[in-house]
Amino acid sequence: MRFAIVVTGPAYGTQQASSAFQFAQALIAEGHELSSVFFYREGVYNANQLTSPASDEFDLVRGWQQLNAQHGVALNICVAAALRRGIVDETEAGRLGLASSNLQSGFTLSGLGALAEASLTCDRVVQF
């Protein structure tokens, strides 16, 4: 079965993103296909490369990055939500005249069209 996940919670402070990550791992372990994860609203904080958890905590941002690298899962973040929350890639940083970017590699700024496409092409869309 082909799945897409929507994450609306930040990397830390709620269980949404952590639960989504564990669900993603379980899907892959059970042989399902996870085509994409779409980060929306507060979920865009999962793509902030400046996140620095305590040494005894799981690094969820890098966990998502590994999921992308090892399994080819697309990590799309809503561009409008990201810009409102200060998450920018190099292109947007240049366009806005910012000194630097902070989008973690492996993540892609995307529009809601990426979520619509996932909804149409996947068997299930699960939101956390």
UniProtKB/Swiss-Prot annotation:
Belongs to the DsrE/TusD family. Pfam families: DsrE (PF02635). Its main location: cytoplasm. It is an enzyme of class 2 (transferase). This is Sulfurtransferase TusD. It comes from the Bacteria. It comes from Escherichia coli O17:K52:H18 (strain UMN026 / ExPEC). InterPro entries: DsrEFH-like, Sulphur_relay_DsrE/F-like, Sulphur_relay_TusD/DsrE. Keywords: Cytoplasm, Transferase, tRNA processing. One of its GO terms (biological process) is tRNA wobble position uridine thiolation. One of its GO terms (cellular component) is sulfurtransferase complex. One of its GO terms (molecular function) is sulfur carrier activity.
